[in-house]
Protein backbone atom coordinates (compact mmCIF):
# COMPACT_ATOMS: atom_id res chain seq x y z
CA UNK A 1 0.00 0.00 0.00
CA UNK A 2 2.83 2.37 0.93
CA UNK A 3 4.65 1.56 -2.35
CA UNK A 4 1.50 2.25 -4.37
CA UNK A 5 1.01 5.64 -2.70
CA UNK A 6 4.69 6.51 -3.21
CA UNK A 7 4.51 5.66 -6.94
CA UNK A 8 1.33 7.71 -7.33
CA UNK A 9 2.93 10.65 -5.52
CA UNK A 10 6.03 10.44 -7.75
CA UNK A 11 3.80 10.28 -10.82
CA UNK A 12 1.95 13.37 -9.63
CA UNK A 13 5.23 15.25 -9.14
CA UNK A 14 6.34 14.29 -12.67
CA UNK A 15 2.97 15.28 -14.13
CA UNK A 16 3.09 18.63 -12.34
CA UNK A 17 6.61 19.21 -13.67
CA UNK A 18 5.51 18.33 -17.22
CA UNK A 19 2.53 20.66 -17.06
CA UNK A 20 4.72 23.47 -15.69
CA UNK A 21 7.34 23.00 -18.42
CA UNK A 22 4.74 23.07 -21.22
CA UNK A 23 2.45 25.73 -19.73
CA UNK A 24 1.91 28.85 -21.82
CA UNK A 25 0.70 30.69 -18.70
CA UNK A 26 4.24 31.10 -17.34
CA UNK A 27 5.74 34.60 -17.58
CA UNK A 28 8.54 33.09 -19.67
CA UNK A 29 7.80 29.89 -21.56
CA UNK A 30 10.20 27.06 -20.66
CA UNK A 31 9.29 24.14 -22.94
CA UNK A 32 11.14 20.88 -23.39
CA UNK A 33 13.72 22.58 -25.57
CA UNK A 34 14.15 25.15 -22.80
CA UNK A 35 15.11 22.40 -20.35
CA UNK A 36 18.28 21.97 -22.41
CA UNK A 37 18.57 25.58 -23.57
CA UNK A 38 18.70 27.21 -20.14
CA UNK A 39 21.68 25.27 -18.68
CA UNK A 40 23.70 25.33 -21.92
CA UNK A 41 23.31 29.08 -22.50
CA UNK A 42 24.02 29.81 -18.83
CA UNK A 43 27.17 27.65 -18.99
CA UNK A 44 28.35 29.36 -22.20
CA UNK A 45 27.66 32.84 -20.80
CA UNK A 46 29.37 32.26 -17.44
CA UNK A 47 32.43 30.62 -18.99
CA UNK A 48 32.66 33.39 -21.62
CA UNK A 49 32.59 36.16 -19.01
CA UNK A 50 35.21 34.47 -16.81
CA UNK A 51 37.49 33.71 -19.79
CA UNK A 52 37.11 37.21 -21.25
CA UNK A 53 38.10 38.74 -17.92
CA UNK A 54 40.73 36.36 -16.56
CA UNK A 55 41.87 33.57 -18.94
CA UNK A 56 45.66 33.25 -19.38
CA UNK A 57 47.22 33.48 -22.88
CA UNK A 58 46.46 30.67 -25.36
CA UNK A 59 48.90 28.95 -27.73
CA UNK A 60 46.48 29.37 -30.67
CA UNK A 61 48.97 28.49 -33.46
CA UNK A 62 50.49 25.54 -31.59
CA UNK A 63 54.01 27.01 -31.83
CA UNK A 64 54.54 27.87 -28.15
CA UNK A 65 53.72 31.55 -28.65
CA UNK A 66 50.69 32.22 -26.44
CA UNK A 67 48.29 34.99 -27.44
CA UNK A 68 46.67 36.98 -24.61
CA UNK A 69 42.95 37.64 -24.97
CA UNK A 70 41.60 38.55 -21.53
CA UNK A 71 41.20 41.89 -19.77
CA UNK A 72 43.54 40.91 -16.93
CA UNK A 73 46.34 40.23 -19.41
CA UNK A 74 46.42 43.70 -20.96
CA UNK A 75 43.43 43.82 -23.30
CA UNK A 76 40.47 46.20 -23.43
CA UNK A 77 36.87 45.67 -24.56
CA UNK A 78 37.84 46.15 -28.22
CA UNK A 79 40.98 43.98 -28.32
CA UNK A 80 39.82 41.34 -25.83
CA UNK A 81 38.52 37.90 -26.84
CA UNK A 82 38.17 34.29 -25.87
CA UNK A 83 41.01 32.93 -28.01
CA UNK A 84 40.29 29.77 -30.09
CA UNK A 85 41.78 26.46 -28.97
CA UNK A 86 45.30 25.52 -30.04
CA UNK A 87 46.27 24.23 -33.48
CA UNK A 88 48.02 21.46 -31.54
CA UNK A 89 44.58 20.26 -30.44
CA UNK A 90 43.20 20.47 -33.99
CA UNK A 91 39.69 19.03 -34.20
CA UNK A 92 40.04 16.89 -31.09
CA UNK A 93 37.27 17.25 -28.51
CA UNK A 94 39.02 18.91 -25.57
CA UNK A 95 36.93 18.98 -22.38
CA UNK A 96 38.55 19.71 -19.02
CA UNK A 97 38.96 16.01 -18.16
CA UNK A 98 41.06 15.40 -21.31
CA UNK A 99 43.79 17.75 -20.07
CA UNK A 100 46.48 16.74 -17.58
CA UNK A 101 45.78 19.86 -15.53
CA UNK A 102 43.63 22.97 -15.52
CA UNK A 103 46.68 25.04 -16.50
CA UNK A 104 47.22 22.87 -19.59
CA UNK A 105 43.52 23.15 -20.51
CA UNK A 106 43.68 26.93 -20.28
CA UNK A 107 46.99 27.12 -22.16
CA UNK A 108 45.50 25.11 -25.05
CA UNK A 109 42.33 27.22 -25.23
CA UNK A 110 39.87 24.77 -23.69
CA UNK A 111 37.38 27.52 -22.71
CA UNK A 112 36.79 28.32 -26.42
CA UNK A 113 35.46 24.83 -27.11
CA UNK A 114 33.39 24.86 -23.92
CA UNK A 115 31.79 28.18 -24.90
CA UNK A 116 31.06 27.45 -28.58
CA UNK A 117 29.69 23.93 -28.04
CA UNK A 118 27.34 25.04 -25.26
CA UNK A 119 26.44 28.17 -27.24
CA UNK A 120 25.59 26.18 -30.38
CA UNK A 121 23.46 23.69 -28.46
CA UNK A 122 21.82 26.68 -26.75
CA UNK A 123 20.87 28.47 -29.98
CA UNK A 124 19.71 25.22 -31.62
CA UNK A 125 17.39 24.57 -28.68
CA UNK A 126 16.27 28.23 -28.65
CA UNK A 127 15.15 27.70 -32.24
CA UNK A 128 13.35 24.52 -31.21
CA UNK A 129 11.73 26.40 -28.32
CA UNK A 130 10.41 29.02 -30.77
CA UNK A 131 8.74 26.23 -32.75
CA UNK A 132 7.44 24.61 -29.56
CA UNK A 133 5.80 27.81 -28.26
CA UNK A 134 4.29 28.51 -31.69
CA UNK A 135 2.86 24.99 -31.69
CA UNK A 136 1.38 25.36 -28.20
CA UNK A 137 -0.27 28.67 -29.16
CA UNK A 138 -1.61 27.37 -32.48
CA UNK A 139 0.58 29.73 -34.49
CA UNK A 140 2.27 29.06 -37.81
CA UNK A 141 5.93 27.88 -37.56
CA UNK A 142 7.76 30.58 -39.52
CA UNK A 143 9.38 32.38 -36.55
CA UNK A 144 11.86 29.55 -36.00
CA UNK A 145 12.45 29.32 -39.77
CA UNK A 146 13.50 32.99 -39.81
CA UNK A 147 15.75 32.43 -36.79
CA UNK A 148 17.44 29.56 -38.63
CA UNK A 149 19.37 32.15 -40.69
CA UNK A 150 21.55 33.52 -37.85
CA UNK A 151 21.77 29.99 -36.43
CA UNK A 152 23.16 28.77 -39.77
CA UNK A 153 25.63 31.68 -39.87
CA UNK A 154 26.90 30.97 -36.34
CA UNK A 155 27.19 27.25 -37.09
CA UNK A 156 29.17 28.04 -40.24
CA UNK A 157 31.85 30.16 -38.51
CA UNK A 158 32.10 28.21 -35.23
CA UNK A 159 31.71 24.60 -36.42
CA UNK A 160 31.67 23.99 -40.20
CA UNK A 161 34.62 26.26 -41.01
CA UNK A 162 36.94 24.75 -38.36
CA UNK A 163 35.97 21.25 -39.53
CA UNK A 164 36.77 22.13 -43.14
CA UNK A 165 40.10 23.74 -42.21
CA UNK A 166 41.09 20.93 -39.87
CA UNK A 167 41.39 22.82 -36.58
CA UNK A 168 39.28 24.78 -34.12
CA UNK A 169 42.12 27.32 -34.04
CA UNK A 170 40.66 28.53 -37.37
CA UNK A 171 37.27 29.26 -35.78
CA UNK A 172 36.15 32.83 -35.20
CA UNK A 173 37.59 34.34 -31.99
CA UNK A 174 34.99 35.50 -29.46
CA UNK A 175 35.77 39.21 -29.44
CA UNK A 176 35.54 42.39 -31.49
CA UNK A 177 39.09 42.63 -32.91
CA UNK A 178 39.16 38.85 -33.23
CA UNK A 179 36.06 38.95 -35.41
CA UNK A 180 37.64 41.52 -37.73
CA UNK A 181 40.87 39.52 -37.85
CA UNK A 182 38.83 36.44 -38.82
CA UNK A 183 37.11 38.40 -41.61
CA UNK A 184 40.38 39.77 -43.01
CA UNK A 185 42.09 36.36 -42.98
CA UNK A 186 38.98 34.78 -44.51
CA UNK A 187 39.18 37.28 -47.39
CA UNK A 188 42.91 36.63 -47.80
CA UNK A 189 42.54 32.86 -47.97
CA UNK A 190 39.16 32.46 -49.67
CA UNK A 191 38.42 35.70 -51.58
CA UNK A 192 34.95 35.80 -50.00
CA UNK A 193 34.11 39.21 -51.51
CA UNK A 194 34.16 37.55 -54.93
CA UNK A 195 31.87 34.68 -53.89
CA UNK A 196 28.31 34.93 -55.30
CA UNK A 197 26.74 33.61 -52.09
CA UNK A 198 28.40 36.36 -50.05
CA UNK A 199 27.08 38.89 -52.57
CA UNK A 200 23.57 37.51 -52.02
CA UNK A 201 24.07 37.87 -48.26
CA UNK A 202 25.10 41.52 -48.67
CA UNK A 203 21.97 42.10 -50.77
CA UNK A 204 19.93 40.38 -48.06
CA UNK A 205 21.29 42.44 -45.14
CA UNK A 206 21.42 45.82 -46.89
CA UNK A 207 18.15 45.19 -48.72
CA UNK A 208 16.50 44.10 -45.48
CA UNK A 209 17.64 47.33 -43.81
CA UNK A 210 16.31 49.38 -46.72
CA UNK A 211 12.94 47.59 -46.76
CA UNK A 212 12.62 47.85 -42.98
CA UNK A 213 13.25 51.61 -43.09
CA UNK A 214 10.86 52.03 -46.04
CA UNK A 215 8.10 50.06 -44.32
CA UNK A 216 8.51 51.79 -40.96
CA UNK A 217 8.57 55.27 -42.46
CA UNK A 218 5.57 54.59 -44.74
CA UNK A 219 3.46 53.22 -41.89
CA UNK A 220 4.48 56.05 -39.52
CA UNK A 221 3.64 58.61 -42.22
CA UNK A 222 0.16 57.19 -42.88
CA UNK A 223 -1.14 56.71 -39.32
CA UNK A 224 -4.82 57.35 -38.75
CA UNK A 225 -5.07 60.53 -36.65
CA UNK A 226 -6.41 59.74 -33.17
CA UNK A 227 -4.63 62.44 -31.14
CA UNK A 228 -4.24 66.21 -31.04
CA UNK A 229 -1.15 68.10 -32.16
CA UNK A 230 0.09 68.37 -28.57
CA UNK A 231 -0.10 64.62 -27.84
CA UNK A 232 2.19 61.81 -28.90
CA UNK A 233 0.91 59.82 -31.88
CA UNK A 234 1.58 56.66 -29.89
CA UNK A 235 -1.39 57.42 -27.62
CA UNK A 236 -3.63 56.89 -30.65
CA UNK A 237 -3.12 53.15 -30.49
CA UNK A 238 -4.65 50.83 -27.89
CA UNK A 239 -3.16 47.35 -27.61
CA UNK A 240 -5.52 44.79 -29.12
CA UNK A 241 -7.74 47.29 -30.96
CA UNK A 242 -9.58 45.87 -33.97
CA UNK A 243 -9.25 48.90 -36.27
CA UNK A 244 -6.18 49.36 -38.48
CA UNK A 245 -3.85 51.93 -36.97
CA UNK A 246 -2.59 53.13 -40.37
CA UNK A 247 -4.09 53.59 -43.82
CA UNK A 248 -2.51 50.98 -46.10
CA UNK A 249 -4.37 52.43 -49.11
CA UNK A 250 -2.69 55.81 -48.53
CA UNK A 251 0.72 54.17 -48.13
CA UNK A 252 0.16 52.09 -51.28
CA UNK A 253 -0.94 55.16 -53.22
CA UNK A 254 2.07 57.18 -52.10
CA UNK A 255 4.66 54.53 -52.91
CA UNK A 256 2.93 53.51 -56.14
CA UNK A 257 3.19 57.10 -57.36
CA UNK A 258 6.72 57.55 -56.04
CA UNK A 259 8.05 54.56 -58.03
CA UNK A 260 5.30 52.87 -60.08
CA UNK A 261 2.08 51.05 -59.21
CA UNK A 262 3.36 47.47 -59.16
CA UNK A 263 6.41 48.31 -57.04
CA UNK A 264 4.03 48.80 -54.10
CA UNK A 265 2.42 45.91 -52.21
CA UNK A 266 -1.37 46.01 -51.95
CA UNK A 267 -1.51 42.96 -49.67
CA UNK A 268 -0.29 43.34 -46.10
CA UNK A 269 0.34 39.60 -45.70
CA UNK A 270 2.51 39.22 -48.79
CA UNK A 271 4.35 42.42 -47.81
CA UNK A 272 5.30 41.09 -44.39
CA UNK A 273 6.28 37.70 -45.80
CA UNK A 274 8.62 39.52 -48.19
CA UNK A 275 10.09 41.62 -45.35
CA UNK A 276 10.84 38.42 -43.42
CA UNK A 277 12.03 36.26 -46.31
CA UNK A 278 14.44 38.68 -48.01
CA UNK A 279 17.12 38.95 -45.28
CA UNK A 280 16.64 35.34 -44.18
CA UNK A 281 17.31 33.90 -47.64
CA UNK A 282 20.32 36.22 -48.05
CA UNK A 283 21.87 35.09 -44.76
CA UNK A 284 21.15 31.44 -45.62
CA UNK A 285 23.21 31.92 -48.76
CA UNK A 286 26.09 33.53 -46.89
CA UNK A 287 26.15 30.69 -44.35
CA UNK A 288 26.15 28.23 -47.26
CA UNK A 289 28.99 30.18 -48.88
CA UNK A 290 31.13 30.10 -45.73
CA UNK A 291 30.39 26.38 -45.38
CA UNK A 292 31.64 25.69 -48.93
CA UNK A 293 34.68 27.95 -48.55
CA UNK A 294 35.46 25.96 -45.40
CA UNK A 295 36.47 23.17 -47.79
CA UNK A 296 38.38 25.64 -50.02
CA UNK A 297 35.78 26.06 -52.75
CA UNK A 298 36.64 29.74 -52.89
CA UNK A 299 35.39 32.94 -54.52
CA UNK A 300 35.94 33.73 -58.19
CA UNK A 301 39.54 34.28 -59.30
CA UNK A 302 39.96 36.63 -62.25
CA UNK A 303 43.68 37.26 -61.67
CA UNK A 304 45.63 38.14 -64.82
CA UNK A 305 42.56 37.61 -66.97
CA UNK A 306 43.43 40.31 -69.54
CA UNK A 307 46.58 39.99 -71.64
CA UNK A 308 47.74 42.19 -74.51
CA UNK A 309 48.94 40.95 -77.90
CA UNK A 310 52.48 40.60 -76.59
CA UNK A 311 51.39 38.39 -73.71
CA UNK A 312 51.87 41.08 -71.06
CA UNK A 313 49.32 41.19 -68.24
CA UNK A 314 47.01 44.20 -68.10
CA UNK A 315 46.17 44.57 -64.43
CA UNK A 316 42.52 44.93 -63.42
CA UNK A 317 40.83 45.43 -60.05
CA UNK A 318 40.91 41.63 -59.67
CA UNK A 319 44.71 41.81 -59.62
CA UNK A 320 44.64 44.65 -57.08
CA UNK A 321 42.41 42.51 -54.84
CA UNK A 322 44.79 39.58 -55.30
CA UNK A 323 47.76 41.74 -54.22
CA UNK A 324 45.80 42.87 -51.15
CA UNK A 325 44.88 39.26 -50.34
CA UNK A 326 48.54 38.21 -50.49
CA UNK A 327 49.50 41.12 -48.24
CA UNK A 328 46.90 40.14 -45.65
CA UNK A 329 47.92 36.50 -45.87
CA UNK A 330 51.63 37.10 -45.19
CA UNK A 331 50.74 39.27 -42.18
CA UNK A 332 48.59 36.74 -40.34
CA UNK A 333 50.15 34.01 -38.17
CA UNK A 334 53.48 35.72 -38.88
CA UNK A 335 55.65 33.17 -37.08
CA UNK A 336 53.75 30.06 -38.16
CA UNK A 337 54.59 30.32 -41.90
CA UNK A 338 57.56 31.38 -43.98
CA UNK A 339 55.41 32.15 -47.01
CA UNK A 340 51.72 32.54 -47.75
CA UNK A 341 50.22 29.20 -48.73
CA UNK A 342 49.78 30.37 -52.34
CA UNK A 343 53.53 30.85 -52.73
CA UNK A 344 54.55 27.83 -50.68
CA UNK A 345 52.34 25.57 -52.82
CA UNK A 346 54.31 26.33 -56.00
CA UNK A 347 56.84 23.65 -56.95
CA UNK A 348 60.39 24.77 -56.24
CA UNK A 349 62.57 25.35 -59.34
CA UNK A 350 65.25 22.75 -59.97
CA UNK A 351 68.83 23.88 -59.36
CA UNK A 352 71.50 22.42 -61.63
CA UNK A 353 75.02 22.74 -60.30
Swiss-Prot record:
GO biological process, one term: response to herbicide
Binding site for a quinone: 215, 264-265
Gene3D superfamilies to which the protein is assigned, alphabetical: Photosystem II protein D1-like
Transmembrane segments: 29-46, 118-133, 142-156, 197-218, 274-288
Residues annotated for chlorophyll a ChlzD1 binding in this entry: 118
Posttranslational modification: Tyr-161 forms a radical intermediate that is referred to as redox-active TyrZ, YZ or Y-Z. C-terminally processed by CtpA; processing is essential to allow assembly of the oxygen-evolving complex and thus photosynthetic growth.
Keyword annotations from UniProtKB, A to Z: Calcium, Chlorophyll, Chromophore, Electron transport, Herbicide resistance, Iron, Magnesium, Manganese, Membrane, Metal-binding, Oxidoreductase, Photosynthesis, Photosystem II, Thylakoid, Transmembrane, Transmembrane helix, Transport
Site (described: Stabilizes free radical intermediate): 190
Propeptide residues per the UniProt entry: 345-353
Chain sites annotated for binding [CaMn4O5] cluster: 170, 189, 332-333, 342, 344
Cofactor binding description: The D1/D2 heterodimer binds P680, chlorophylls that are the primary electron donor of PSII, and subsequent electron acceptors. It shares a non-heme iron and each subunit binds pheophytin, quinone, additional chlorophylls, carotenoids and lipids. D1 provides most of the ligands for the Mn4-Ca-O5 cluster of the oxygen-evolving complex (OEC). There is also a Cl(-1) ion associated with D1 and D2, which is required for oxygen evolution. The PSII complex binds additional chlorophylls, carotenoids and specific lipids.
EC annotation from Swiss-Prot or TrEMBL: 1.10.3.9
Enzymatic reactions: 2 a plastoquinone + 4 hnu + 2 H2O = 2 a plastoquinol + O2
Family indicated by similarity: Belongs to the reaction center PufL/M/PsbA/D family.
Job of this protein: Photosystem II (PSII) is a light-driven water:plastoquinone oxidoreductase that uses light energy to abstract electrons from H(2)O, generating O(2) and a proton gradient subsequently used for ATP formation. It consists of a core antenna complex that captures photons, and an electron transfer chain that converts photonic excitation into a charge separation. The D1/D2 (PsbA/PsbD) reaction center heterodimer binds P680, the primary electron donor of PSII as well as several subsequent electron acceptors.
Protein name per its UniProtKB record: Photosystem II protein D1 2
Taxonomic path: Bacteria, Bacillati, Cyanobacteriota, Cyanophyceae, Oscillatoriophycideae
Gene that this polypeptide is encoded by: psbA3
Amino acid sequence: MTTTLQQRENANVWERFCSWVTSTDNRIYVGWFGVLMIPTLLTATICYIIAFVAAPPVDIDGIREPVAGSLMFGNNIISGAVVPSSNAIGLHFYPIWEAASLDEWLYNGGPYQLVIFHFLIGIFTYMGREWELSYRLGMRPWICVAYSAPVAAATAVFLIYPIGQGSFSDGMPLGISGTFNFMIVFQAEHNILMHPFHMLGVAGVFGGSLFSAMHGSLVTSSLVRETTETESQNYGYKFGQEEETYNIVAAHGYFGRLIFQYASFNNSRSLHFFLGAWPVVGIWFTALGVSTMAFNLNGFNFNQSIIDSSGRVINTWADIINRANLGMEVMHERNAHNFPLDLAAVEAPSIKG
